[in-house]
């Protein structure tokens, strides 16, 4: 299995899909590939278009091809920023889970010490109904 770098840019209403590894590729019959670019109308089509293009030029099965896609729009490194956003969302999810666990634990401890449910809600910044749910969970 071979991994190809795929560089995607925007050109008017099209996504230009460049596969630098295909420039000058020599086929089994000696033909030289002169182009490294195809296009896609939608970003969701890029992976499939790139793999189809690579398979057509190299005459290999799609199962033998992997692609590493980078997207750049007028100097915006879309790939890097999207990865950063995904990472931050994952961190936020973990922090939210930890905060939920800590809130539940604190609510239970306060309730065991006789603190009123409404006061537990005030401490945690939630309604008394939510405080009761945390205590009961």
Language-model features: locations:
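Short, Lys/Arg-enriched anionic-surface-contact patches
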Residues: 79-105
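Generic anion/oxyanion-binding catalytic loop in active/binding sites
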Residues: 35-36, 96, 109
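Short, mixed-charge low-complexity intrinsically disordered segments
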Residues: 62-81
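Major-groove recognition helix of helix-turn-helix-like DNA-binding domains
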Residues: 129-137
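Short basic helix-loop element that most often maps to the first helix and adjoining turn
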Residues: 6, 107-116
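Short alpha-helical "recognition helix" segments of helix-turn-helix
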Residues: 116-124, 131
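DNA-contacting interfaces and partner/effector-binding or oligomerization modules
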Residues: 1-66
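DNA major-groove recognition helix of helix-turn-helix
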Residues: 111, 124, 135-136
